[in-house]
Amino acid sequence: MTATKHILAIHAHPDDVEILCAGTLALLAGKGHRISIVSMTPGDCGSADRGPEEIAAVRREEARQSAQRIQAEYRCAEFRDLSIFVNDSARRKVTGLLREIRPEIVLTSSSADYHCDHEATSALVQDACFAAPAPNYASEGSSAPPLPAIPHLYFVDRIEAGEDEQRDFFVDVSSVFPTKRAMLAEHRSQRDWLKKHHGIDDYLEQMERWCAQVGRRAGVQYAEGFRQCHRHSYPQVPILQELLTEYVRV
């Protein structure tokens, strides 16, 4: 029997995880694995009508409700929208967060995406995974001890990934797509904002189209794509693929 693992999905804003990997998290949760979800910011710029603190409070609660649908823990790292920078303080803060959560598997954003917060998150999380086991590296905002090892690191697709997206494998999320959709639907504050700012009329329908597009490439109805970090010193065992063998497509 496979031992229970702790999986952390950390992306820039509330709803990014739901769009890009909530189906995979639902499958893992259904197998009894522990799931944590972190947004780097509370989405404080995600409104044209509410002030930053008001919309941030709304979006934190939406993210909690979404996470609860798969019995996951939600936390916010409390950076601010458009203000995530790759620097020493941010790297130490994210390292401290990883030491507190103590995941064995980390899913994070693509290093090449449309939003600067997504790209900065990817770089910071990769650095933090490397730094978290180093006892002489002091984290910021946490006294948690170093991790025993570098976590297995995976990158999700970029938003609206095209034919040129580099992936190692897909996860067939067709069986849990209703859960993925319900998780994203908790972020109801974003419908008007995305329509006004992004030109997206229905964010649920848009997510479904994206997920179906990835599914066609995988030969299934709905899928999510992943790339494992194969850089020196990062774990190379395909642990996520092994946990979800029956759902993996290459």
Predicted segments — roles?
Residues 2-8, 85-250:
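Metal-dependent de-N-acetylase/amidase catalytic core
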Residues 1-101, 227, 239-246:
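Active-site rim/loop-helix segments in enzyme catalytic domains that contact anionic ligands
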